[in-house]
Amino acid sequence: MKSKQIVISILAVLFVSPLMGTFAQQAASSGSIEVITTFDYPGTGNQTLPQKINERGDVVGEYIDSSGVARGFVRFSDGSFSDPIVDPNDNVGFTEGRGINNSRSVAGDYAISDGTLHSFFWSGGTFTEYDVPSTVQTNLLSINDAGDFTGAFDPDGSGIFQAFVSIDGTLTSWSVPGAGSTFAYEINNSNELVVGYYLDGAVLHGYYRDVNGVLHFPIDPSGSVATVLFGLNDKNWVVGRYASAGVTHGLFFLPPSNFFTFDYPGSTFTSLNGINDRGIICGRYVASGIAHGFLARVRGTPPTQPMAPGMMPNKAPSLVAPLNPSPAEWGDAMPAR
């Protein structure tokens, strides 16, 4: 699929409502999310899964080819793509680009033949391997402009991950009380918030960790059966997705309790994965079983008043979440993409 920037700009003028999602529960004038363009990593049949975006507008992510091989990529702000990013130790065809900062330093992970995940930093074509010391698996998920980074690690090979953040070289880990695995997906430049998700049995819930180290959970829109918080910016605008009644919606979250929904037109699966300080969002939608990347922008000012009752945080136990419904949607792997 080629870039649709010109087409979408025209359609936005002719048919505003299909391409602009107004923040739920608020007046239309208060703010909206507007699609800018769509994109796919070059090649036939590739699933394109954007993950994070920097202030330049560079997007890091991964693509999955028709044989199921996953490789990382960077889509630069001019619309060009990097060569496939493949960690030299990846011997099973699984390398992911997960985070990118304004210096274009990339954080990601890869798998090896014993099924374990390991991580890397990539800058200027050079790989630097990284594993949390004395652990079996490490999953890097973001890097900020100071070089601080987040992710998760499995200390003993059990497959149960603990979230962590490394700030100024000091690593701090945590788990949501009572949870299985906990993942830390991004930290902003002010180190005010870390966002992510955790597993409660087979159910996914969002959470955030504030500057004082306090965990706030569960972060679930009412009716959600699976919530993931993927990215945030220095304004503490958070993006992610949630599933409800067989549809996966893009999620815009303003702490502590405001949720707003965005659905790509005509798709039953939308994921918002990264957002920069200019309000540019990267994410994906699924059409005919194929995942496509898109860029969108926040228009106007996101509302800050409390939500209507139908969108308050879900404090009741969630229903059973659908497990990996398709490679296009979940990437057929955990941690979520």
Tell where the protein language model's regions lie, with residue ranges.
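Residue-level hotspots at or immediately adjacent to binding/recognition sites across diverse folds
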Residues: 21-337
